[in-house]
């Protein structure tokens, strides 16, 4: 085994594992592309040292005519590596990426929980995370939802977590490892369907931004998400302390301290009202509706206002 920079990064991921879970069971979602094969190569190189049982799972969306041949190639690869192989094929047509992703994770979680596996490994790279960040930014998602993209471990249950061992490497790195190891890559032409939004970002927008604005765009977005995540954690700690002083319970019900709320900066006011509205009424409102509510609170002369479930924003 030739140790490369990707092997060193992978070892850093192994050190993050719970020591009690090392040598246990792992499920790897496989597609046959360069990212998943690079992850399989790293797992096989350190299998005897760190890992116990491995299972490969291939989910066939049946978008391609040769998808069954792709599955057969992966099956032969699993036989060569002495790893169990599971194949799932959809019985209905999946018309969108969202439906395909939901169906794929449903099967991956099903087999992981059924056999009581410790980790579900996916081959998402830093390039995938960066592309998803841009995709969600242009769709005007909340910054907290973007921060959730950057994770190495996502705990589903006490005994199972989804893990991304390649979250710190780019797609160019995985291609280099596959070329160095002569791995049998399978070209997926659905990645070039430009009517899919994510493919258009990957094939057109992302290369344009890297070529003309920032050649290290993945690293920049990685730092952007990380710094925002730290700032958000700090902000949430402050807001929880403020929230406990502004909202409270009495015999008459839940009350809202108007006089103390008015002393806060407008930015804090907006976040407090938005998050409280979601926790209490389980939905989000538009920014214009929240601005009207904040304006109504500014005109309120009472010291405290009791909140009822029947209240609504016009």
UniProtKB/Swiss-Prot annotation:
Coarse class of the protein's main subcellular location: plastid
Which residues of the sequence carry a binding annotation for ATP? 31-36
Q: Matching Pfam families, A to Z?
A: ATP_bind_3 (PF01171)
* EC class name: ligase
Q: What keywords does the record list, in alphabetical order?
A: ATP-binding, Chloroplast, Ligase, Nucleotide-binding, Plastid, tRNA processing
Q: Give GO cellular component annotations, separated by semicolons.
A: chloroplast
Task: Give its E.C. classification number.
Answer: 6.3.4.19
Swiss-Prot/TrEMBL catalytic activity:
cytidine(34) in tRNA(Ile2) + L-lysine + ATP = lysidine(34) in tRNA(Ile2) + AMP + diphosphate + H(+)
* Subcellular localization: Plastid, Chloroplast
GO MF, one term, reads: ATP binding
- The source's domain of life comes to Eukaryota
The record's section on HAMAP family has:
tRNA_Ile_lys_synt
Comment on protein domains = The N-terminal region contains the highly conserved SGGXDS motif, predicted to be a P-loop motif involved in ATP binding.
Q: Which family does it belong to?
A: Belongs to the tRNA(Ile)-lysidine synthase family.
Q: What is this protein called?
A: tRNA(Ile)-lysidine synthase, chloroplastic
Q: Which organism is it from?
A: Cyanidium caldarium (Red alga)
